[in-house]
Amino acid sequence: MFGLRNLRRGLSLCRFYSKPRPTPAPIKQDSQQSSQLPEWQKREKAHRKRYGNWNPTKRLSRAQMQDLRSLKQQMPHMKTIDFANLFKVSPEAIRRILQSKWTPTEEEEARLAARAQSAKNKSAQRRQQQIDNLKQAHSRMQPVTGIVEDARTSAIRPRNPRQRKPRQHQGQKTQQTQHDHDSHQPYVPSVGDVLE
């Protein structure tokens, strides 16, 4: 009755109205501008659209770069994004590493290893210097062995805290002969206080 043709048309209309569509005017202008651009700018634009801006937060070591290249040779079906998730770096960084064909010669490799070792030694020396400075600063400080007292207050305050008189609590009578409370316990009124 309705036919396959009408059913397909209805499905395509449903898909058309269910998805938001971008306005066609900027796309035409963009395509006209991109046709006038040189090839390298088109390629850069396509890379930016695909991967986003290149802002590397983590750098891979040379050994990791070599591992990445060998993995790509062993598994060419893996995509750049998969490698980016594996190494936890941006896909753009992975693309640049895989695109580069530079390999160091033996002399360059020795020079790079020496530079890395000297940087490591400088870092260790800097760390040791900081530790030595902290030890010197700690040794210059003299430990306080007793309570530092001010001459103005030492005459007023008794030296031994146990020789102090017990504090008078709220509701407590000033002359207390029958009830000697421990100075550490708060005063609690009892039946005997009411009877007196």
UniProtKB/Swiss-Prot annotation:
Transit peptide limits: 1-22
Pfam families reported in the protein's UniProt record: Neugrin (PF06413)
Statement: the UniProt record of this protein carries the keyword Hydrolase: no
Polar residues bias: start-end ranges: 29-38, 118-133
Residue span of region Disordered: 19-48, 103-196
Biased composition (Basic residues): 159-170
InterPro entries recorded: NGRN/Rrg9
GO cellular component: mitochondrion; nucleus
Function noted in UniProt: Required for respiratory activity and maintenance and expression of the mitochondrial genome.
Protein name: Required for respiratory growth protein 9, mitochondrial
Source organism of this protein record: Meyerozyma guilliermondii (strain ATCC 6260 / CBS 566 / DSM 6381 / JCM 1539 / NBRC 10279 / NRRL Y-324) (Yeast)
UniProt lineage: Eukaryota, Fungi, Dikarya, Ascomycota, Saccharomycotina
